[in-house]
């Protein structure tokens, strides 16, 4: 078990705020929009660690995941990764599995509040049970195939489940964007809100859920994510292995 005060202020890139059992998880970079980095101690490791603690905390009953400012995540900083070799990729491989698996191990409802463009790790939001998106939000995977990297860190599994195999492959190969309204039409966005009302609406839904029996929430989340967890268990490690081999080949190793 985890106790919120023991980890609430532990993370540099993840701001945690809890009120009445509702936990807001906000990713950021020095108080501004988050920048994704897989360097040692970067958000790639921190967010998975945060999900691990949240999953072990019986005091949290609903989670709201969001970004900072007008952007969820659009930038990647590769400078901090350092020399890419087998040991570095072993670390990234482990962190990549933890990121997805620890998120899915959270046994309370997760609401994704999409505050703007989500072009990097948009799957973290769309894996939420309820996705509330700003009218300005767009979803894409621009950090993999468009940059010569294999999309193997779970996006190859989840976007296929959301969009179907052909649409997902087009989405991942091209880095094309899907707007909030189109996401709602396709079924992975629940509600589209005015830009300045997204987080507020997510909290409204969180309060509605919070009023329901806690064990019902936990057991429902577990039932609804079991098939996703099974697919990730089967295919996430394989995808990460191929992604690592591709990265090393790009570097001539």
Predicted regions and their residues:
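Well-ordered beta-strand positions
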Residues: 129-130, 170, 174-176, 182, ...
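C-terminal long alpha-helix characteristic of the crotonase
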Residues: 132-137, 189-236
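Glycine-rich beta-to-alpha transition loops that act as phosphate-gripper elements at the mouths
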Residues: 113-118, 172-176
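Glycine- (often His-adjacent) and acidic-residue-rich active-site loop
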Residues: 31, 39-41, 59, 66-98, ...
């Amino acid at each position: 078990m985890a106790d919120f005060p023991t980890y609430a202020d532990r993370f540099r890139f993840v701001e945690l705020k809890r009120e009445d059992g509702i936990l807001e998880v906000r990713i950021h970079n020095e108080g501004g929009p988050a920048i994704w980095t897989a360097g040692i101690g970067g958000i790639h490791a921190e967010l998975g660690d945060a999900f691990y603690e949240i999953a072990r905390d019986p005091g949290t009953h609903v989670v709201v995941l969001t970004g900072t400012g007008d952007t969820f995540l659009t930038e990647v900083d590769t400078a901090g990764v350092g020399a890419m070799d087998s040991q570095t990729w072993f670390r990234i491989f482990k962190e990549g599995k933890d990121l997805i698996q620890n998120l899915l191990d959270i046994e309370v409802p997760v609401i994704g509040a999409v505050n703007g463009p989500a072009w990097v790790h948009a799957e973290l939001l769309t894996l939420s049970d309820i996705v509330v998106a700003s009218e300005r939000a767009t979803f894409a995977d621009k950090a993999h195939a468009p940059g010569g990297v294999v999309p193997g860190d779970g996006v190859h599994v989840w976007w296929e489940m959301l969009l179907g195999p052909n649409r997902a492959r087009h989405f991942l190969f091209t880095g094309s964007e899907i707007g909030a309204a189109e996401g709602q039409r396709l079924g992975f966005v629940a509600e589209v809100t005015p830009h300045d009302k997204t987080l507020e609406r997510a909290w409204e839904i969180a309060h509605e859920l919070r009023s329901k029996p806690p064990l019902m929430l936990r057991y429902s989340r577990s039932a609804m994510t079991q098939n996703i967890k099974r697919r990730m268990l089967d295919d996430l490690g394989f995808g990460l292995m191929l992604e690592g081999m591709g990265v090393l080949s790009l570097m001539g190793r």
